[in-house]
């Protein structure tokens, strides 16, 4: 899920809730600030232009601020703001005037200026401060436990019953009736390839749908989620300032690693870095496994590995620390899980995380594992296995690009700069991955796309050509015929049309007898 898709999913959920609930949401400055952050860029611009303006603004004036190339973005921004009831239209003297929702305007203004926020951003407790390392390690343990469970890693302690229930309702995992064990679904495989903020919101959106059937107040739930994204990591916050619904939520948020408490009955809680990602655009943590690996990262030199090619001449050189220093890259600047992808489809992952390796094995044939690196090969079989599990070629390519080694990105940028020097009008995009690898992964997907499976019934062994022609023509007339072979007197019909053809056959063939 891209950053745009993530924000679209969240705003779409907010757009679908009743207007009365939306208006209650806008009473919280923290919530209004969070909603502002996930709106389209043009919508943010319009809001900033109106939030401190007491007068109505002609809609035509907003249209004039956008050039001809941005008309589609303009329409999307206005549509989103109207769906959220952020814009209040007023048609006077033939001109359509608009203004911001007054409740939203006041709350956002207070959030921006530090006005009357009414504990919207929590109540800070100055003492009982804990270290950031402790919070990082705690959130790492909680979140990776969920992801390890999904990929089937043996665990000493599995996630809580509520987390398992959420994974099942999200259709990321399914329970095997015969054994009671959980297994990952196609959606679950795709979930593992998303960035961590997308993963968090995938679970939280399902969490919101589940609590709609409970007695919990939806507005209080949303207030708490958006508030967590605005709190400061490392500071303690009073639980007494929370509503009854939000106190119940605290246990669930602990299970996800969003908040930390020294003891379950403590009167304070601490937000973690995971909570900040709910409303942040930061990409400092690029994926769930990468985020958690960063907690345990150590400064270490990367070894040099040489492999003879098939013809005995080609050599694969893994970047050494000296090479990286020359390129302006230090060891600590290289995120764990960084990948090097070569034109011969070999892949090197700088990681010793079992989770990172497990995710990589979803579409890579792993060959060897070293202290801080894994060697693998992208093969037709490994890609087809991933494709049949619901992962798309674009998702695999996006994952490889997102986790590309900084040296690969640097070389791609230098190559593009040289092309632009020769041809300033060159519109070729930045190619971080080898084009041969990207094209081949897409071709392997096309192989599977050529084959479409249908459920249905095969009719054959007809005694006469008349019987075959009668039934095949009837199946074709009612639109359920999927395939036929007149020479072999066989045809295949859809599952939905089988009962109709059988009834027709019984009536017509019985008359002939």
Swiss-Prot record:
Its main location: nucleus. One of its GO terms (biological process) is nucleotide-excision repair. Residues 296-319 are annotated as: Disordered. The keyword Iron does not apply. GO terms for cellular component: nucleotide-excision repair factor 3 complex; transcription factor TFIIH core complex; transcription factor TFIIH holo complex. It comes from the Eukaryota. The keyword Transport does not apply. One of its GO terms (molecular function) is ATPase activator activity. Keywords: DNA damage, DNA excision, DNA repair, Nucleus, Transcription, Transcription regulation. Transmembrane segments: none annotated. It is found in: Nucleus. Present with 8900 molecules/cell in log phase SD medium. Belongs to the TFB2 family. Component of the 7-subunit TFIIH core complex composed of XPB/SSL2, XPD/RAD3, SSL1, TFB1, TFB2, TFB4 and TFB5, which is active in NER. The core complex associates with the 3-subunit CTD-kinase module TFIIK composed of CCL1, KIN28 and TFB3 to form the 10-subunit holoenzyme (holo-TFIIH) active in transcription. An additionnal subunit, TFB6, plays a role in the dissociation of the SSL2 helicase from TFIIH after transcription initiation. Interacts with TFB5. Component of the general transcription and DNA repair factor IIH (TFIIH) core complex, which is involved in general and transcription-coupled nucleotide excision repair (NER) of damaged DNA and, when complexed to TFIIK, in RNA transcription by RNA polymerase II. In NER, TFIIH acts by opening DNA around the lesion to allow the excision of the damaged oligonucleotide and its replacement by a new DNA fragment. In transcription, TFIIH has an essential role in transcription initiation. This is General transcription and DNA repair factor IIH subunit TFB2. It comes from Saccharomyces cerevisiae (strain ATCC 204508 / S288c).
